[in-house]
Amino acid sequence: MATHEEFIRTQVFGTVFEITNRYTDLNPVGMGAFGLVCSATDTLAGQPVAIKKIMKPFSTAVLAKRTYRELKLLKHLRHENLICLQDIFLSPLEDIYFVTELQGTDLHRLLQTRPLEKQFVQYFLYQILRGLKYVHSAGVIHRDLKPSNILINENCDLKICDFGLARIQDPQMTGYVSTRYYRAPEIMLTWQKYDVEVDIWSAGCIFSEMIEGKPLFPGKVHVHQFSIITDLLGSPPRDVIITICSEDTLKFVTSLPHRDPVPFQERFKAVEPDAVDLLGRMLVFDPKKRITAADALVHPYLAPYHDPTDEPIAEAQFDWDFNDADLPVDTWRVMMYSEILDFHKIGGSDGQIDTNAAFDDQVAAATAGPMLPLWLNSNININNSHPVNIQVQLLRHQQPRITVVYQ
């Protein structure tokens, strides 16, 4: 049906936040490299929400693709321990806003306030691994797991967020961005070859930080980070060294003096044996020998929470077909509009598209009102069922005009 919502423009930390009047009581809660997050009240649902502004998503093809990837992932990944997308809209200034559940805090802030008791460490780790089991089963690697990306509410319910850097499970990765403290050693050594095990390493670093109240590997720079990892784990084994792609990296690693590993039981003397054992299985140099999320869930340390009937996997693998595409901004824009329309369920349950007058109103609601002047013409897929050709004329201060042709 048609929308009667209007946009309201507000300044937050010097940034224009342009949202519909459905959302009120804006308060900034976080700022990242790609967007600003505010808490708000959803007056329609009567509940608090978090609104993430993606600034200038169509300024470059790289940013457009990144935003499209995050939106696709948020739509596909639906799990109790992952942040859930509740709404998405495009503002008149062409910024994109993701609306999700509001959690009270994040693990980074929680760790700064007080030490965690054993039962909280167990419960939080269990939820992290439960979420990772699902994510990995969908063929997705988070790639940037860290305490600030782990949200927690007053009931201690935990949700993993920020899938903007997530990637396909592929042994030949290109490029990597993460917070240094939680970065797996294979990233530093091989750069282009990594898999879901990088998330297990990050989770292990977070596990240790929850136990001790401080980062386990607080590297100051890349080389220092690797050095303090070897202080605990010893020199990398031959199976890891032979995977190093860079000649300079190989020369650096082989030039280092040999270091023996420190037994985890000695390093974590005050920690219960089951916790030390699980930590030792997560923080292993060789990713092939690192424990999986599914296996970690059945470890004795997590026995108080483990429930094999309530640790689901994804129903389907995430479709990464778009990921290698090198497309212009306008094409990413069309694809983004398609995903927004799909999210707002323009099509019926059978995937058919309603082309009557009400459809135009629904399109206007989904794309959130006036747009920049632009002709878009592209083959896209609505509801992943009927291939269609959609011609969209978006005119400032006018309803979008849509022509739908079934192929």
Curated annotation (Swiss-Prot):
Main location, first listed in the record: cytoplasm
Give the UniProt entry's GO cellular component terms.
cytoplasm; nucleus
Query: Which amino acids does the record list as binding ATP?
Result: V29, G30, M31, G32, A33, F34, G35, L36, V37, K52
The family database entries (Pfam families) matched by this protein are listed as: Pkinase
Q: Which PROSITE patterns match?
A: MAPK, PROTEIN_KINASE_ATP, PROTEIN_KINASE_DOM, PROTEIN_KINASE_ST
Is Cell cycle a UniProt keyword of this protein? Answer: no
Q: Which reaction does it catalyse?
A: L-seryl-[protein] + ATP = O-phospho-L-seryl-[protein] + ADP + H(+); L-threonyl-[protein] + ATP = O-phospho-L-threonyl-[protein] + ADP + H(+)
Keywords assigned by UniProt, alphabetized:
Activator, ATP-binding, Cytoplasm, Kinase, Nucleotide-binding, Nucleus, Phosphoprotein, Serine/threonine-protein kinase, Transcription, Transcription regulation, Transferase
Q: Which organism is it from?
A: Zygosaccharomyces rouxii
Record protein name field: Mitogen-activated protein kinase HOG1
Q: How is it modified after translation?
A: Dually phosphorylated on Thr-174 and Tyr-176, which activates the enzyme.
Question: According to its UniProt record, which residues of this chain constitute the active site?
Answer: D144
The record's subcellular location field reads:
Cytoplasm; Nucleus
Gene, per the UniProt record: HOG1
SUPFAM superfamilies attached here?
Protein kinase-like (PK-like)
Post-translational modification Phosphothreonine, affected residues = T174
Q: Where is this motif: TXY?
A: 174-176
Q: What does this protein do?
A: Proline-directed serine/threonine-protein kinase involved in a signal transduction pathway that is activated by changes in the osmolarity of the extracellular environment. Controls osmotic regulation of transcription of target genes.
Regulation of catalytic or functional activity: Activated by tyrosine and threonine phosphorylation.
Q: What GO terms describe the biological role, i.e. biological process, of this protein?
A: stress-activated MAPK cascade
Cofactor(s) the protein needs: Mg(2+)
Family affiliation: Belongs to the protein kinase superfamily. Ser/Thr protein kinase family. MAP kinase subfamily. HOG1 sub-subfamily.
Could you name the domain of life of the organism this protein comes from? Eukaryota
Q: What is its EC number?
A: 2.7.11.24
